[in-house]
Every structure is written in C-alpha cells, then in structure tokens.
Amino acid sequence: MKQAQVLTKEEIKKVIKVCELTKHADRNKLIVYLSFWSGMRAIEIANLRVKDVLSADNEVLDAIALNKTQTKGNKGQTVYIGKALKKELAKYFAKFPRIAEAKQSHLLRTQKGNFTSITIQHLFKHLYTLANIPNATSHSGRRSFITELSEKGVS
C-alpha cells in the first residue's frame, strides 16, 4: 500500500486557510489541527468525546487517553496535546460553550449526527481538493506529524 503524502508547512497553511472558507470553519480547522498537530487517525478524531479532552472543571487536558474502542488495532493509547493544539481546543470550547457542557457527546458533529472515520476521510479529501493538493489523504496529517517528530530526533 502506498504511503500517505507528507505535506510541507506551506501546504498545511494552505489547508487551514481553505478551512476558513468553509461553512463550519472552526470545526474543520480543529479536525485538521488534531490530525497534523497530534498525529491522530481519522477513526480517533471521529470517536473523540468532549470528556476525552476536557477535565471536569472545563480545562483542556494535557493528554487524551483513547480506549481500545476509539482506536485502530483494538488497544488504547495516549495522545499528548501540545501547547498550540491546547490553545486551539480552548478557543473552540470558548466559542462553543454548549459543546463543552455535553461531556459525554462526541467532540465533533455534523448536521446529521456524529462523524465517522469515513466522513472525516471525505472531509479531508474535500479540503485537499479545495487546497489543490491532489495526492494527500486523511492519513497525511498523521504521517506529516510523525515525520516532523522524526526529523527533530524524537523517537
């Protein structure tokens, strides 16, 4: 299977800029940030719940503990939240306080209900098409994140 394309910093900025032109700009940017800034897979983003990222006193957590039903491979994992992503999550909850109140609900929703890994993949395809990045996939964010960490010497 062909590996997902790694995006340059300029291409990532282009995708974020394209998000700003969409109807649900804040939500779409958060999805892009979760992929590119934490390396989360589409299925993990789709399965995120508010309680996974917010404490009982509405503070953004330093790490997301994903259980085995939320991940690929049927085993749990911890996703660390960097400063930039933490700031974006806090801004998102400040702008949409009703989302923060519904701790058991999915973090990201469509008008028809919860996202699925397939709808996340379709959203990425749409955003990459708008940004004129034809070979990128929903996995490009994860691959770009991991490649950047590797280049910085993180193992």
Task: Label every model-predicted segment.
Residues 70-90, 103-124:
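C-terminal catalytic core of Y-nucleophile DNA break-rejoin enzymes
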Residues 4, 23-26, 76, 114-119, ...:
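N-terminal core-binding DNA-recognition domain of tyrosine site-specific recombinases/integrases
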